[in-house]
Amino acid sequence: MTLWAINRAAHGRRENYAIKIIQIKEGFCVCESGFTMYEFFKIDDRVLKAAEEAEQKAAPYLAKISETQRYNQEKMQAAFMQAGVSESHFVATTGYGYGDRGRDVLDEVYARALGAEDALCRYNFVSGTHTLTVALFGVLRPGDTMLSVTGMPYDTLRGVIGITGDGNGSLKEFGINYEQLDLLPDGTPDYDGMETAITPKHRMVYIQRSRGYSLRPSLTVEEIERIVKIAKRRAPDCIVMVDNCYGEYVQKMEPTAVGADLMAGSLIKNPCGGIAPTGGYIAGRRDLIESCAYRLTTPGTGREIGCTLGNNRELFMGTFHAPNVTGEALKTAVFTAALFEGFGFDVTPRYDEPRADIIQAVQLREREALCAFIRGIQQGAPVDSFVVPEPSPMPGYDCDVIMASGSFTFGSSIELSADAPLREPFAAWMQGGVNFNSGRLGAILAAQSMLNAGFLNL
């Protein structure tokens, strides 16, 4: 049987083309070229076979994620019901925003869903780093010392602390001291070292849950709980703060549910389901949240001021969908790990290892192989799929960075995205995928891009 496929949309215009289809196999069209038209995509049969094998291999772990999704979605449903969310909470406010009921109820939903005493959820936070900065400046005072027990923080936070940059406006300039306990050589926390490093002089013990641009394991809630217990034994009055970016709803509990005093994250990552246009949250002890609110606005007014400009509906909607969307992103990561491990690349975590965030690192070994992977992820995006990512400088980083992010919200990392500093070990850090089907396709297109560039031996 011979069929001819004509007309396709490309780069916003219609183009005619003809591919001779020689066979219909299992719902897909096999072309003379040896490629399978995956209905709408030109993917090599060998890549498709590898993808099928990867998904079969990962099936038990995908099922476990589904169970966590279900639990966390029920928890979120309960939080909405207990807070009494109603349509009236979607009403916009302007000006000072006094009496914004939706804003206050959204805070309650976050506190309940995250297992915290209180929470502060605002679209006014412009990034995860900004949210963390408000929390740090909100609770630390001149002369205080913070101790990071997970080694060097993420690149963009180093300028906030005063480790890099000219120090202008940093914690260091305000007389707040910084100390650091490195991780063990295998990237795990140095619990024995904490027993001596943490002392009553430390006002804050700081934990970065996610790996950032490193290959160390992200921290599970159980590991964070162990750190909390050591910190509270060694320095009972210290504040244990967690950078929870990329970690929300990955497990059934959050750090605040196991004793962390404060944690923060970005709404364009896990907590708002790919719907929030911007924002962040801080959750934890009620007295600390009040201090953070005073830092965000002004002492005395705190959380009682700040209009929402019609954003409440999107924030409520995204928050409700977040547990399910996070699970879809996790499934995408597990599938990608299984697929690229099958191609012979080192991945972390492996498909069968416990996960504490949505990030999947794939070591591509070579600069151009890395670029091919990133470009393939971009090709699988619903927005700007025709864009070809190129390495370029980026504020806060010490080398060129290449990024794929064809997202509806600029910079959203709960939507399928990938980024990588152009330095050894030439690893791509991929995250997101608001539904598994589209995320799976993105990973397959990344593999096809690498095959086309000559970096897969099949």
How should each PLM-predicted stretch be described?
Residues 341-458:
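Conserved C-terminal alpha-helix-loop-beta "cap" of PLP-dependent enzymes
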Residues 38-59, 66, 75-82, 86-89, ...:
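Conserved PLP-enzyme active-site core in the AAT-like
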Residues 94-102, 106:
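N-terminal small-domain helix-loop-helix segment of the aminotransferase-like
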